[in-house]
Structures are given as structure tokens and as C-alpha cells.
Regions:
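Glycine-rich phosphate-binding loops of nucleotide-dependent enzymes
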Residues: 1-127
Length: 127
């Protein structure tokens, strides 16, 4: 159990120690621990559902850095997010769903964030 904890802390790359208590961790650090656990168990697919909701700016940055580490490790990540700036920053592919159905699939890096926003607004008006 201690080795698992050390692996997770190593993934986090910050000042969390084996003596840290969950109650003293920030929301971003808790998200990082959850991601680190999935990484430790070699999950092929990691699903993050609104991982930046209710987090501060610094914590959001940490979560986005975690997603980058997931990608660098070669694992697949489904990142469910409403913040298009975050999507643009980390997503290789964007699948837009409406009532559970795919309505569009695009490469976010092919557009700027304002263009992506405009595209999705237009898409919503057509629905």
C-alpha cells in the first residue's frame, strides 16, 4: 500500500508526503491523487468528467498538467468539459454530443478558441 502511495505522489510531482491527510489537500491535489491512482493501476482509459469544476486557477492548471501527463504516458483519456479553453488546450479530438448523440467531431487545434466557440454556437442554433 505504501508503494502505491509513493507512486501516486511521484506522479503528482509536488510536496505531498505519505503523511499528508486528504482533508489538507486542495481540490486540484485531490483530483491529481485520483488521476495518479488510475495511472498506478495502468488504466488504459481514464475518464475525467468536469475535472476542473469548482477549482481555482492554480488547481485548474494542475489538472490540465495531469491530463498532459496522461497523454504523454500513451493512455487514452476521455475529458468531459464545458470550458472550451481547457478543451482547446488538451484535446486531440472534440466530439460534440446532443442528448447522447454525436452531432459533430472536430480537431480543436484547427481553430482558435473564439472560432471554436462560434462553431459550437452555430451548431447549437442548427439543432
Amino acid at each position: 500500500a505504501q508503494q502505491i502511495l509513493l507512486d501516486v505522489i511521484g506522479f503528482r510531482g509536488v510536496g505531498i508526503t505519505v503523511d499528508s491527510t486528504v482533508a489538507n489537500l486542495s481540490g486540484g491535489e485531490r483530483q491529481g491523487i485520483a488521476i495518479g491512482r488510475a495511472m498506478h493501476y495502468n488504466a488504459d482509459l481514464i475518464v475525467l468528467d468536469e475535472p476542473t469544476a469548482a477549482l481555482g486557477v492554480a488547481e485548474v492548471r494542475k489538472v490540465i498538467d495531469f491530463v498532459r501527463k496522461i497523454k504523454q504516458s500513451g493512455r487514452a483519456c476521455i475529458y468531459i468539459e464545458h470550458n472550451l479553453a481547457h478543451v482547446h488546450e488538451v484535446a486531440d479530438r472534440l466530439v460534440v454530443l446532443d442528448r447522447g448523440r454525436i452531432v459533430s467531431e472536430i480537431i480543436p487545434k484547427d481553430m482558435t478558441v473564439p472560432e471554436l466557440t462560434e462553431y459550437l454556437i452555430d451548431l447549437q442554433h442548427k439543432a
